Regions:
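Active-site C-terminal subdomain of aminotransferase-like
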Residues: 107-127
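Helix C-cap/helix->beta junction micro-motif
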Residues: 52-53, 162, 198, 242
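Structural signature of PLP-dependent enzymes
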Residues: 112-119, 134-157
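Conserved glycine-rich beta-strand-loop-beta hairpin in the small C-terminal domain of fold type I
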Residues: 132, 148-159, 167-180
Length: 246
């Protein structure tokens, strides 16, 4: 694992990579748990860094389509010699159907095909038919995106009022990665109390970062807006009851 910094939105940079001897790099933009995205120029710098050193670059672009104030860039804008992973799970809301795709450099297609066939033959026929149909659901999918956007705005407006002042830039996806160091040094204990007492489910940062994750929690806003508003009120009550909020 490459240690990233809050300064760079928890995304790797060539400077970060220079400290490691690596043969491959996996990036995610938008990412989970932060929701942050790599800007176009830094992404190009990563592509060039890897190309110059013959480092295989794998770009997880599964959350493409779910973004707010900035447009995502793909590594294919800068090179054909990268691997791109994508899926119907997130933007197309087909998580349980287990279907996606990968873009591979032409000379590696057969290699990747053999690896894939050793794990499974193909996605189920039903999943493939539904995936084709998903392309016709643009209106519904954009409505989902508007719901995420509204939920995001409600949370970004409310959470600082409860003392959550340090949140990773939620450029895309549907997560907030929140610093709780002012309240706790044990993210698991914090989210357990939030669930048991407040009735709101969050994810402890240690699930994503065993070194620095005890000061972070992840919150998902991929629900209906009334549910998010209900959750905001519950968080407020919890923070007051636990004396975190005066």
């Amino acid at each position: 694992l490459i240690n990233t910094t809050e300064k760079n939105k928890f995304q790797p940079t060539p400077t970060d990579l220079s400290r490691y001897n690596i043969n491959g790099l996996l990036i995610a933009s938008p990412g989970n748990p932060t929701g942050s995205m790599i800007d176009r120029e830094p992404l190009e710098a990563l592509v060039n860094y890897c190309a110059d050193r013959k480092i295989s670059l794998i770009s997880d672009e599964i959350y493409h389509g779910i973004q707010y104030d900035m447009q995502p860039s793909t590594v294919l804008e800068f090179s054909d010699n990268c691997y791109i992973i994508n899926s119907f799970s997130k933007y197309f809301s087909m998580t349980g159907w287990r279907i996606g795709w990968i873009v591979v450099p032409k000379e590696h297609v057969r290699i990747v095909e053999r690896i894939q066939q050793n794990m499974f033959i193909c996605a189920s026929h039903a999943s493939q038919i539904l995936a084709i149909g998903a392309f016709e659901g643009k209106v519904e999918l954009e409505k989902n995106l508007m719901t995420y956007k509204e939920n995001r705005e409600h949370l970004l407006n409310a959470l600082p009022e409860f003392g959550f002042n340090n949140i990773a830039p939620p450029d895309g996806a549907f997560y907030l990665y929140i610093d709780i160091s002012e309240f706790s040094s044990d993210s698991y204990d914090f989210v357990k109390k939030m669930l048991d007492i407040g009735g709101v489910a969050m994810t402890p940062g240690i699930d994503f970062d065993p070194i620095n994750g005890n000061s972070k929690i992840r919150l998902s806003y991929a629900r209906s807006t009334p549910e998010i508003l209900n959750g905001i009120e519950r968080i407020k009550i919890f923070m007051k009851e636990k004396k975190y909020l005066q």
